[in-house]
């Protein structure tokens, strides 16, 4: 798609210094490691039976229906699964379709869930991590922090390229590592109807991109086949900070547009070979680091900067984008289309652990004694015509309006965490899910469909399944705990039953035995012109997939916040962390629909305190000592 020979010629003719083209691979060894050694052994994603999905489906919709509605839905499901019914035919087609596929769902899912989605990726799709503070000079110095992020990210990339990174194995089950193929040198690119993924050879594109003052710079990752030293990386970043080039117009804001609008602006940009070459470099880069000029202090300010910033000193189509503010605060944003959060959590955990272990005095000495670097950072030139200038102005205005329409709060509860929760002999994930359901019920008085992401990476090319976290048991739990006349014993009993059911459903979902992906697959098997089975036209079908709460957690001791947007206008996005001594929930919702994030935050505090009090007394009270 992109003319790289032209790109090189443009840069040779520019007034900026040029960087030698690197041709040597990262390593002279052709031996590969174990990163993908389990791939051929991974099972394929199963196709559940009609009967098990139908049974689960009815149980998941029951909390939302009165008896008459439930009987109507049962009749439609029974008609669907009966011998000779539509479900039987669709199931046979799906089984046949799946027979020769690595993963039957992957054939549809990336396009359906991500690539054909036309709303802006930020704030609606991408997710952010806000890194915890580093309590030394590294955490206060923008260039020191950015140097280490770049250095350890390049090191991680080398392990992916030579496959020496250890494959992930959880409780004896190897996980699919396919997503790591799309981690580096990759970008989402706007296209008609459905976006595409543009992937580049990492050994032929040994550079990353730095964004500073809305300008884009190309920085090498290797010299003569060797990773740059920390001192060399620092020197490049320092050069960029000292560059007198005026602040850019904010071309990165174009990536915040609706995808069709971004496509139109993108096609206009491509009319210039200069733009085509520069965009090609950004797309092909290993990753992006944005050096911001702001100084976020509170956890809310840090989260907002990582989630969206001002929308200009960014390039939202890259799957790996790091941010470092002027005061050293850092974070990460992940474009979601080819990778879920678990691979990028591993990346961030790995590099941040190394940053925390770095001795700042040794780092300063190492940088000060570094040999001179071998070239200069290249600024990527852009030819901004009047149409592009107007498009950028329009993108900035729309981005500001979109962000202003969002209401964001942070529930950062230092009262307790998984250390205490485990003493209740319950899954910490189930506990926090019930905490959020209780808070939502106290706030709205309603029980609404709730989504939790369940990883299916134990299967080849597995990504996620829906965890339907609302159940008859969780309904009983929130109703009992909201009843002033309920006894503590009843509260404990309903809590335990709801937690048990939660674990059971999430475990089944992780085993590929959820409801939503199977029903989705069956629906894809309907041929043009065929009647739509009533199970799919039943109002409860769409309602039960309307996520008034969209939730997920990630495992990290190195984040202080993470999050994303709500998925419907009158819903909440709830991203949570469960650390040993604290619980975090990032709350987002749309303004103007009667919901307020600070109100839900208050009910989260209230519910967290109540659950701790009741369960401590009901489950942890020591037996009286014998006389």
Curated annotation (Swiss-Prot):
GO CC annotations, alphabetized: mitochondrial inner membrane; peroxisome
Presence of keyword Transferase: yes
InterPro entries: Carn_acyl_trans, CAT-like_dom_sf, Cho/carn_acyl_trans, Cho/carn_acyl_trans_2
Intervals of motif Microbody targeting signal: 625-627
Catalysed reactions listed for this entry: (R)-carnitine + acetyl-CoA = O-acetyl-(R)-carnitine + CoA
Subcellular location: Peroxisome; Mitochondrion inner membrane
Annotated residues for binding of (R)-carnitine: 451, 453, 464
Pfam family, one: Carn_acyltransf
Topology class, membrane: Peripheral membrane protein
Binding site for CoA: 418, 422-429, 553
Gene3D superfamilies reported in the protein's UniProt record: Chloramphenicol acetyltransferase-like domain, Choline/Carnitine o-acyltransferase, domain 2
Any single biological process term in GO: fatty acid metabolic process
Keyword tags: Acyltransferase, Fatty acid metabolism, Lipid metabolism, Membrane, Mitochondrion, Mitochondrion inner membrane, Peroxisome, Transferase, Transit peptide, Transport
Family note: Belongs to the carnitine/choline acetyltransferase family.
Protein name: Carnitine O-acetyltransferase, mitochondrial
Species assigned in the record: Candida tropicalis
Gene (name only): CAT2
